[in-house]
């Protein structure tokens, strides 16, 4: 009954759903011959929210509705990563298609879209890890970096491959739904290659065995992870994480792969019309983009793993010009970072072009790529950063070629006259 007569004869209105009178609730809203109170409306809203969350889990993972286009992804990568244009294009398309696929999940269709995991091949310090980190930050998804060299088969001393998923969960406060649409970057994947391209008769717990374990994770499995970082034991309840929709990016330097590619291309280039090139002429940057699955198998990756990494992007070895650009151009450029640090002391930092050239050449000589740039700049500025808080009146610090070479010290510019760091 929506209305009754009270003891005083007044007509009382009641909620048609919970039966409470108009005096027991804050608001009673009338419809055609029915009434609903504010408490029932709140309850209905809560039920709708819960059901929407359940259908989102079953029908498809929550993915950013404003997914950036490949061009927008590429532009964002350009702000942090210098060069590697082809690799950025390949990554932008692969990541866009992956998250577009997640939006498509749960829709009834004849076509099932497969996941496109990525393999990055390039020298140390060429930007493999930075590309993966930048992508995860752009898409605002959980991200974890795993080192393949620390992994072993289950049951052996070392990290289990499922520890990767545990770290991913930690990075998103153990929200399983978020982790299931995250990005995993596995570094040093080339270091777990089997020792020869023939299957081994002995146990290879940190090579082929790890590849087999990673294979299950990458292609999609239910990983059992102990809650809140606990250790595994038999009577424990595990969190179940489906890795089917996690994007895996594997990276490695693959030292020596260019020789395998060259040998293959030399065999196919025999005859009168073959172009003869000396080995010295064959630049790594020219050879690596010609990589084929058979080359990776010969290097020591198992065919099944290569099949699960269909998108292959090669990164070029960075030259002097690229390294100089990396020092000053990106949003998080090393020179900008040190200028900011010194600006906090009220001091301007100037690194002259000759010094930038010297830094780039030193990194090339060390064969550390962009990764080695920071340590060179840090070493050059160490004494200045140590002494600066105690020096009053310093306006500017100048770094030139001699500072990088170790022949001279940074120049401290005072209001009155220049003074060399460390001099009396």
Curated annotation (Swiss-Prot):
Signal peptide: none annotated. GO terms for molecular function: ATP binding; ATP hydrolysis activity; ATP-dependent protein folding chaperone; protein dimerization activity; unfolded protein binding; zinc ion binding. InterPro entries: AAA+_ATPase, ATP-dep_Clp_protease_ClpX, ATPase_AAA_core, Clp_ATPase_C, Clp_protease_ATP-bd_su_ClpX, ClpX_bact, P-loop_NTPase, Znf_CppX_C4. It comes from the Bacteria. SMART domains: AAA (SM00382), ClpB_D2-small (SM01086), zf-C4_ClpX (SM00994). ATP-dependent specificity component of the Clp protease. It directs the protease to specific substrates. Can perform chaperone functions in the absence of ClpP. Component of the ClpX-ClpP complex. Forms a hexameric ring that, in the presence of ATP, binds to fourteen ClpP subunits assembled into a disk-like structure with a central cavity, resembling the structure of eukaryotic proteasomes. Belongs to the ClpX chaperone family. This is ATP-dependent Clp protease ATP-binding subunit ClpX. It comes from Ralstonia nicotianae (strain ATCC BAA-1114 / GMI1000) (Ralstonia solanacearum).
